[in-house]
């Protein structure tokens, strides 16, 4: 991409896997999959992109670069049967704030967007009671569309250089 466009100004880390269930008797391979995608994927992508973002922040026309990490409301509020998913999203939030403090003086803005329920395939990887729980939530709530999240990202990365959105919650209006 850098060869094609010449620079990297914005990184959006938006990969995620949500496998729900009780901790007792859990399939630890599912935990490893979630940690690999939700945490390690974000870390490795950020590590690869950061030198390019730091360079872009020094140059015209924007003189700023952005990292937006997509987390979840599950990175702020824990629920039964969400344990490892909660762990990964709390981790994303902590990493985001730490990185923000490291690179903000170098004009790389780092923020986290924490959506509530969104119409994606995220819940489809579950089965049984957990799938029923997710389906019931979707049926009872007017959940967000992907465009709502894209609009939030656009808002974060189009602020003037002097303004940084460190955290943005985007929730369905009727999600408690």
Regions found by a protein language model. Give the residues of each.
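Conserved amphipathic alpha-helix within the SDR
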Residues: 1-6
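Active-site helix of classical SDR
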Residues: 46, 88
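Alpha-helical segment proximal to the catalytic Tyr-Lys
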Residues: 51, 101-104
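C-terminal helical subdomain
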Residues: 112-113, 120, 131-176
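Substrate-binding pocket helix/loop in short-chain dehydrogenase/reductase
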Residues: 22-23, 30-32
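Residue(s) in the substrate-gating loop at a strand-loop-helix junction
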Residues: 72
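Active-site loop immediately N-terminal to the catalytic Tyr-X3-Lys motif
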Residues: 24, 77-83, 141
């Amino acid at each position: 991409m850098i060869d094609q466009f010449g620079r990297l100004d914005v990184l959006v880390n938006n990969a995620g896997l949500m496998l729900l269930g009780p901790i007792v008797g859990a399939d630890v391979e599912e935990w490893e999959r979630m940690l690999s995608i939700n945490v390690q994927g974000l870390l490795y992508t950020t590590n690869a992109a950061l030198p390019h973002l730091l360079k872009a922040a020094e140059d015209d026309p924007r003189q700023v670069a952005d990292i937006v990490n997509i987390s979840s409301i599950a990175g702020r509020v824990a629920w039964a049967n969400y344990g490892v998913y909660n762990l990964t999203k709390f981790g994303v939030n902590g990493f985001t704030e730490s990185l923000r403090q490291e690179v903000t003086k170098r004009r790389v803005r780092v923020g986290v967007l924490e959506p509530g329920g969104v119409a994606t395939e995220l819940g489809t990887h579950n089965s049984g009671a957990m799938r029923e729980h997710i389906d019931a939530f979707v049926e009872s709530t007017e959940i967000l569309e992907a465009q709502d999240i894209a609009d939030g990202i656009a808002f974060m990365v189009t602020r003037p250089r002097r303004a940084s959105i460190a955290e943005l919650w985007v929730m369905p209006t009727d999600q408690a």
